[in-house]
Each structure stands twice: as structure tokens, then as C-alpha cells.
């Protein structure tokens, strides 16, 4: 039986007292977003662009609050410039990134950014953990929250499933 990774990740976020959940709507994060929206101790903030999430997270951290940024790999390109601020200022931020452009991807436009995502994040000083199995996600998230540095947990497309708009 496949673990309920969104429930486990929500539990890890709650245990670490994450209070702000910033996200651009994404089907891969849908269940986790719903759990966070239903949690009275968390404030869910829908973004118009992923870049806004970096600023929100920095402000939250400066104000003493923990946050998480949920996005799809295609949105990583939108945060490249401001992600450098995390390293320069020593601001910890957890990003949970659902991957696109991997094996089985039907949308060829997703492939270049999907392939570039780990390297782009690393070039900006973000530590990258890749979860290829559902049971790896929550431990990677909990570990990132304990170490308080800029970290991206990449969730393989094999875990979240291949999107298909042809059905």
C-alpha cells in the first residue's frame, strides 16, 4: 500500500510548527494544500507566481515564523533570481517541488525545466533532496526543517503520477 505522503508531510510541517504555506495551485500538491487549508494553525497563501513565495517566506522568517513553499518544477524558473537571496542572507526555506518533464511526460514543454531543476536550485545555493518513493518524502521534509537551510525536496513524477489532459 502506497503511504499517504501528503498526510505524513502535513504532520511533519505541523510538528515543526510551520505556520505559513505558500503555493501556486498544482494538482500534485492538491491533497497537501487541502490539509494545510484545513489546519487552523496554518495560513495558506495562494500566490500568483512562485517568486512571491520567496519574499513571503523571507518576511515570515524575519518575523519569527516558519514557512514552506509548494510549487511545480516549471515554477522553479520563476524563483532563480530571488533564490540567491536565501544563501546571501542565510534564510532557511523549505520548498517542496512536484516534478514534471520526467519519463512519460506528455507535454514536451515541461522537459527542459524538469531536467534543469536540480542544477538550477543547487547553483543558487539550495540543497536538493530527491524523493523517488512516497515513503521518502516526509522524512526528507522533516530533515530539512530540522537543519534550517534553504532546501528543496523534489517529488518524482513517478510518485505523483503522470498528468494527462487527453482523458
Short names for language-model regions:
Residues 1-167:
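Thiamine diphosphate
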Amino acid at each position: 500500500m502506497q503511504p499517504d505522503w501528503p498526510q505524513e508531510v502535513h504532520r511533519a510541517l505541523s510538528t515543526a510548527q510551520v505556520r505559513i504555506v505558500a503555493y501556486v495551485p498544482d494538482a500534485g500538491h492538491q491533497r497537501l494544500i487541502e490539509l494545510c487549508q484545513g489546519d487552523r494553525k496554518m495560513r495558506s497563501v495562494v500566490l500568483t507566481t512562485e517568486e512571491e513565495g520567496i519574499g513571503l517566506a523571507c518576511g515570515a522568517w524575519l518575523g519569527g515564523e516558519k514557512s514552506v513553499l509548494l510549487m511545480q518544477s516549471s515554477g522553479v524558473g520563476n524563483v532563480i533570481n530571488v533564490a540567491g537571496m536565501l544563501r546571501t542572507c542565510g534564510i532557511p526555506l523549505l520548498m517542496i517541488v512536484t516534478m514534471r518533464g520526467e519519463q512519460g511526460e506528455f507535454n514536451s514543454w515541461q522537459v527542459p525545466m524538469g531536467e534543469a531543476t536540480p542544477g538550477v536550485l543547487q547553483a543558487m545555493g539550495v540543497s536538493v533532496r530527491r524523493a523517488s518513493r512516497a515513503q521518502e518524502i516526509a522524512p526528507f521534509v522533516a530533515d530539512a526543517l530540522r537543519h534550517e537551510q534553504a532546501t528543496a525536496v523534489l517529488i518524482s513524477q513517478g510518485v505523483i503520477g503522470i498528468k494527462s489532459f487527453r482523458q
